[in-house]
């Protein structure tokens, strides 16, 4: 019935609920591989467990580990580079590459955020690049997520020069 999910998963999360594990196993019907395939086919964002969780995890560990690497959205910053030093008032660029390794989009979206700290670990600046909405990153088959390059240019503590009295002080 995964064709029905094709109507919904691009716009809203899909929740999977499987048969009671122990009962299905007792009848000889359980197949962990089908569970993994269902996450892919339905583009599942959530899955409920119907059995004793520790028992199901112990007996289906490999399949559950594979599911956990794919279910929902999996935003990855695949690489990043930045200057060794940044000066106040001067522009600098952070180069990064982003992908979604999950089966579903990040429905609400969001934007990459970078936090710069000083040598003592104190926060100097929190910077957001609103040119990439991570909700637009495509989903793909396992190990085939496409990477999107992003060049984010920021200036910390830019100097403001009042020209023509456009700056209002209260």
Task: Tell where the protein language model's regions lie, with residue ranges.
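Catalytic-core regions of glycoside hydrolase
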Residues: 1-53
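Catalytic cores of secreted or luminal carbohydrate-active enzymes
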Residues: 32-82
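Composition- and surface-driven signal marking solvent-exposed, interaction-prone regions
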Residues: 59-64, 108-113, 167-169
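Surface beta-strand/loop "capping" patches
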Residues: 66-119
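Residue-level preference for beta-strand/loop junctions
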Residues: 90, 108, 146-148, 164
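Short aromatic-acidic-glycine turn motif
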Residues: 115-129
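A beta-strand/beta-hairpin structural motif
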Residues: 125-161
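Short glycine/proline/serine/threonine-rich loop/turn segments at secondary-structure transition edges
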Residues: 159-169
């Amino acid at each position: 019935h995964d064709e029905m999910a094709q109507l919904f998963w691009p716009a809203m999360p899909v929740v999977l609920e499987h048969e009671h594990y122990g009962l299905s196993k007792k009848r000889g019907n359980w197949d962990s591989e089908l569970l993994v395939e269902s996450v892919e086919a339905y583009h599942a964002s959530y899955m409920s467990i119907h059995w004793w969780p520790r028992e199901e995890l112990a007996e289906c560990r490999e399949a559950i580990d594979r599911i956990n690497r794919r279910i929902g959205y999996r935003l990855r910053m695949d690489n990043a580079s930045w200057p060794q030093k940044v000066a106040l008032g001067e522009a600098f660029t952070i180069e990064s590459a982003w992908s979604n390794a999950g089966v579903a989009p990040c429905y609400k979206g969001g934007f990459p955020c970078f936090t710069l700290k000083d040598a003592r670990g104190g926060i100097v600046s929190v910077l957001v690049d609103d040119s990439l909405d991570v909700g637009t990153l495509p989903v793909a088959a396992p190990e085939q997520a496409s990477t999107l390059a992003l060049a984010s240019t920021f200036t910390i503590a830019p100097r403001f020069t009042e020209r023509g009295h456009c700056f209002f002080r209260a």
